[in-house]
Regions:
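RNA substrate-binding interface of SAM-dependent RNA methyltransferases
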Residues: 2, 50, 104-108, 112-168
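Glycine-rich phosphate-binding loops that contact phosphosugars or nucleotide phosphates
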Residues: 101
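Boundary-proximal intrinsically disordered activation/regulatory segments immediately upstream
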Residues: 1-67, 153-154
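Short loop/helix-cap segments at secondary-structure boundaries that form the rim of catalytic
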Residues: 67-75, 111-113
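A generic structural signal for alpha->beta connector loops
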Residues: 55, 76-78, 144
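Short connector loops at helix/strand junctions that flank enzyme active sites
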Residues: 53, 94-96, 116-118
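A glycine-rich helix N-cap at a beta->alpha junction
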Residues: 73-92
Length: 168
């Protein structure tokens, strides 16, 4: 079961995954180094958990707890409960969707999976997060098996790419 922790100090080290989410360069190094990505909003958080991405922690305002309580019941994870003002101080932006989760990255496809796929979208060096998200959304919408991105492409698990791919 989740452990709920009230936090009122923006410098609390337990909030490190959520600091300065607007700084793309900082996020790239932090997320790659720690193997994490940030899911924003209840819909995205649920979808990530359902897809098998394990959460590291959650950051949310009190009014969002009940809407995610069923998800928390099955997880052994820390839920940092903060005011909306504190969430904005920590993240660097107004958290419109009220809930954030630090999620563990995983390798989703093996070479054998790629070889077995009938239809793949292959993208080389698409560097805009919104474009990557739109490509993923379109590929899913027309029933393609997956999207293969070149190493220099924008991160498909960056917040903006995720929001675009889900239409949120």
């Amino acid at each position: 079961m989740a452990t709920f922790i009230d936090i009122d100090d923006p410098a609390d080290p337990r909030l490190a995954d959520y600091v300065n989410l607007r700084d793309v360069n900082l996020r790239k190094s932090l997320e790659a180094e720690h193997g994490l990505f940030i899911a924003e909003g209840a819909k995205v958080i649920r979808r990530a958990c359902e897809a098998g991405y394990p959460p590291r922690s959650f950051l949310l305002a009190p009014r969002w707890i009940d809407g995610l309580r069923d998800l928390f019941d099955g997880l052994d994870v820390e839920v940092f409960v903060v005011s909306e003002t504190l969430a904005e101080q920590v993240t660097g932006f107004h958290v419109h969707r009220g809930a954030l989760a630090s999620m563990c990255r995983q390798t989703r496809w093996s070479a054998a999976d790629l070889m077995a796929a009938r239809r793949l979208v292959v993208c080389e060096d698409i560097v805009d997060h919104t474009n990557v998200g739109a490509i993923i959304r379109c590929a899913a919408g027309i029933g393609w098996d997956g999207v293969l991105l070149a190493p220099r492409a924008a991160d498909p698990l960056y917040r903006r790419a995720i929001k675009t791919s889900m239409g949120t």
